[in-house]
A protein has these predicted regions:
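Hydrophobic anchor at the beta1->P-loop junction of P-loop NTPases
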Residues: 34
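Conserved substrate/cofactor phosphate-moiety recognition/catalytic segment
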Residues: 51-89
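P-loop (Walker A) phosphate-binding loop of NTP-binding proteins
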Residues: 37
């Protein structure tokens, strides 16, 4: 029997034939999101999962962000502009995902900017309290209008692993990222993940798996996802 085959139970009641099938197959829509620090492999895993599952990928709008290069040159000056751009971009993306009614895998969530990047910039003195409060009130409004992903896959990685992967992909604007900046982000990611209750959560330890180069490691991740996805709609 093929994996995607439907299983039907036929029950005759008052000459009426009733068909039953698992709820998982009733769901045409599913929203999976990949979360993780800079260099954790979100975009790579998004592409690999989209190819494997035939899901529609939605990528982070990083390369087209008009503030990104300026931000890494002068974080204090451009932090608010950058975060508002990302927030607006991701809000529009989530709206599009929910209206599309497809199985989607998304590169980065709307929550990461609000609970990790923006408060980290504020704590480091790189975003004023006025700008941060303005930003967060805007996020809360947008958050009230969107639904959480059905499953978040969090890519956990140590700072050395992040640095290695950042250097490997060789983006010029990331050359100035400091180690303490990545460390602070990691700490905030862990704090957020331990309190996340918006939906299902799967944690993948990137220090232990290399899904970008190892088919065996990718297979491990896929099996972990299968176990979660198959239980989403029970």
């Amino acid at each position: 029997m093929k994996k995607n085959a439907f299983f039907f139970a036929f029950i005759r009641e008052n000459c009426t034939l009733v068909y039953y099938k698992p709820r998982y197959f009733l769901e045409d829509f599913m929203h999976i999101a990949i979360a993780g620090n800079i260099g954790s492999g979100k975009t790579t895993l998004t592409s690999l999962l989209a190819k494997h599952y035939k899901w529609t990928p939605h990528y982070e709008d990083a390369d087209d962000n008009p503030y990104l290069n300026d931000f890494y040159d002068d974080m204090q000056r451009w932090s608010f502009n950058l975060q508002v751009y990302f927030l607006n971009s991701r809000f529009g993306q989530v709206q599009e995902i929910r209206q599309g009614k497809q199985k989607v895998v998304q590169d980065r969530t709307i929550y990461e900017d609000a609970y990790i990047f923006a408060p980290n910039l504020h704590a480091m003195g790189l975003m004023t309290t006025r700008d941060y409060e303005n930003y967060f009130s805007l996020f809360k409004l947008m958050d009230s209008l969107v639904k959480a992903p059905d499953l978040i896959i969090y890519l956990r990685a140590s700072v050395p692993t992040l640095v290695k992967q950042i250097q490997k992909r060789g983006r010029d604007y990331e050359n100035s990222i400091r180690l303490d900046y990545l460390k602070r982000l990691n700490e905030r990611y862990e704090a957020w993940i331990t309190t996340y209750e918006g939906g299902k959560l799967l944690i993948v330890d990137i220090d232990e798996v290399n899904f970008s180069e190892s088919k065996e490691d990718l297979g491990k991740v896929i099996r972990m996802i299968d176990a979660e996805v198959n239980g989403l709609f029970k």
